[in-house]
Amino acid sequence: MIRAFDQLSLPLLRWLDAEDAHRLAIQGLKLLPAVKPRADDAKLAVRAFGLNFPNPVGMAAGFDKNAEVPDALLRLGFGFVEIGSVTPRPQSGNPRPRLFRLERDEAVINRMGFNNDGAEIVLRRLAGRANQGGIVGVNVGANKDSADRVADYVRLIETFAPVASYFTVNISSPNTPGLRNLQQASQLDDLLTKVLEARDRVRRKAGDTPVLLKIAPDLSLAELDDVVHVARSRGVDGMIVSNTTLARPNSLREQMRAKEQGGLSGRPLFRLSTRMVAETFVRVEGAFPLIGVGGIDTGGAALTKIRAGASLIQLYSSLVYKGLGLVESIKADLTSTLLRTGRESLSEIVGADAATITAEDWPV
């Protein structure tokens, strides 16, 4: 089914404007039959944040912003899905065009600006799938015109606690002016204190929903020191490393398209984000797990991200170029690696190469 979907959709979608193609992909997923997914190899199971993931491959936030197709994605083999980013009130985001393919680089630049249907509508959709099962996280953000962004995050935690498998506090999108300032130590401390207090207030009716922090790959190591210190001190359950980058590597082939403003994702982000995973892993010192994101487009890339320190991984931009069949391909490669090396689970290799990657001889 997945192969047929890719064969039919990928050539067509390439001819469309990137955002129109994304919209068509969402509509196509709504039409897929509700077929039970193939059971994953037990070796791929991951226990993290108090949750049991059937496999480590997740759909990153940004694809299903409005919780329209989380169950279709789970049926296609993802171990978990992260919807959003969601803001308290609906917002249209930045003007189009705002999504660009760099095809020769297998990359994407976006300046979407947290366009979404708002908390009320997204909550209704998630509540409607309450008995479906599967891990569906909610990525939360602040409205662009908010007078109190911390209050936005608190409101979203309280709103979505009954339906979220976990929360991602997104303070690292480059497309909302000033949002990344929340990564500064004093502001981050205040934000996480209030977010975790909100989570604790609703614990009785919603359970102990994990709260993760998503960071940018463009932090300096000193800034990363501060972020990890605050995250550990306040007791977050995990971190997602990383969001898109504002950097433009000299290696990009599509230099004219690379001049578009926004966050760069896809293959050119791989080394930068993997280095940031490793740097975060050594600073976290096992206090909580990490999800690695950025440029994962093969089983080998997934393995590298895991060995850098990621317990779980997420995909998005690579699916634009490789199709949804990439999910099963990565899982098959990871299973083969475990069998070949005689290991029982991926947890045995998480962070195995972190020290090497953080060394000077593993340049970005």
UniProtKB/Swiss-Prot annotation:
**Source organism (scientific name):** Bradyrhizobium sp. (strain ORS 278)
Annotated cofactor note: Binds 1 FMN per subunit.
Q: Which InterPro entries match?
A: Aldolase_TIM (IPR013785), DHO_dehydrogenase (IPR050074), Dihydroorotate_DH_2 (IPR005719), Dihydroorotate_DH_cat (IPR005720), Dihydroorotate_DH_CS (IPR001295)
One Gene Ontology BP term is:
'de novo' UMP biosynthetic process
Q: Where in the cell is it found?
A: Cell membrane
Q: What's the catalysed reaction?
A: (S)-dihydroorotate + a quinone = orotate + a quinol
Looking up SUPFAM superfamilies in the UniProt record yields: FMN-linked oxidoreductases (SSF51395)
Main localization of the protein?
Answer: membrane
Give the residues annotated as active site: 173
Q: Which cofactor does it need?
A: FMN
What keywords were assigned to this record?
A: Cell membrane, Flavoprotein, FMN, Membrane, Oxidoreductase, Pyrimidine biosynthesis
Q: Which residues bind substrate?
A: 65, 110-114, 170, 175, 243-244
Membrane topology label: Peripheral membrane protein
* PANTHER family with a match to the protein in the record: DIHYDROOROTATE DEHYDROGENASE (QUINONE), MITOCHONDRIAL (PTHR48109:SF4), DIHYDROOROTATE DEHYDROGENASE (QUINONE), MITOCHONDRIAL-RELATED (PTHR48109)
Q: What does this protein do?
A: Catalyzes the conversion of dihydroorotate to orotate with quinone as electron acceptor.
Homology family: Belongs to the dihydroorotate dehydrogenase family. Type 2 subfamily.
Under the subunit heading, UniProt states:
Monomer.
Lineage, top-rank taxon, reads Bacteria
One GO cellular-component annotation of the UniProt record comes to:
plasma membrane
Q: This chain belongs to which protein, by name?
A: Dihydroorotate dehydrogenase (quinone)
